[in-house]
């Protein structure tokens, strides 16, 4: 399980749009829910807690870490597809800081994985000049992944029996839906 922050992200909207099934009347009969969740490093989480504990006021003094200050760790970037017959499948990449610095000395693992997508988009645009402006979902994912692979670290996929109900309820009663583990209220942490 991962405790993450839900963040607005274009793919969370475009993926849901792409897989929406409309009925004869044009209204959606099925629309999947797509979330973008992010969990910053522990120091950043503490900083966010302090900021929100201070009514959301930005601290007077801030410090952005430079790549040489990040000594250890990895960035895991992936997708969890859930709610199907095999329960859930995670596919993603793990890029360790040491590997990121070897590939691009002034980068970190998170930055390198993100900028690899920008590079793939630029190459795709150069190779498809007549396509115009498109959503990232409309690009050839195989070609993009081919460009990105050297910058993503280890790519893995595996099935899991984990659900948001695993280990719940805990010490206190919760408002959870035990009939369907993948309901949104089971994902939220209150």
Where is each model-derived feature located?
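C-terminal catalytic/substrate-binding lobe primarily of soluble NAD(P)-dependent oxidoreductases
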Residues: 1-190
């Amino acid at each position: 399980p991962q405790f993450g922050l839900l963040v607005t992200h274009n793919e969370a909207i475009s993926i849901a749009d792409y897989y929406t099934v409309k009925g004869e009347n044009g209204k959606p009969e099925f629309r999947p829910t797509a979330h973008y969740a992010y969990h910053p490093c522990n120091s950043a989480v503490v900083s966010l807690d302090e900021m929100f504990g201070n009514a959301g006021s930005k601290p007077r003094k801030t410090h952005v870490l430079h790549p040489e200050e990040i000594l250890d760790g990895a960035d895991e970037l992936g997708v969890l597809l859930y709610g199907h017959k095999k329960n859930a499948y995670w596919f993603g990449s793990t890029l360790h800081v040491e590997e990121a610095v070897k590939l691009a000395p002034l980068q970190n693992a998170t930055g390198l994985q993100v900028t690899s997508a920008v590079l793939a988009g630029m190459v795709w645009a150069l190779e498809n000049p007549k396509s115009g402006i498109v959503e990232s979902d409309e690009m050839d994912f195989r070609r993009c992944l081919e460009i990105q692979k050297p910058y993503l670290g280890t790519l893995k996929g595996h099935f899991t029996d984990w659900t948001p109900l695993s280990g719940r309820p805990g010490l206190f009663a919760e408002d959870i839906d035990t009939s369907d583990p993948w309901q949104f209220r089971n994902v939220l942490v209150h």
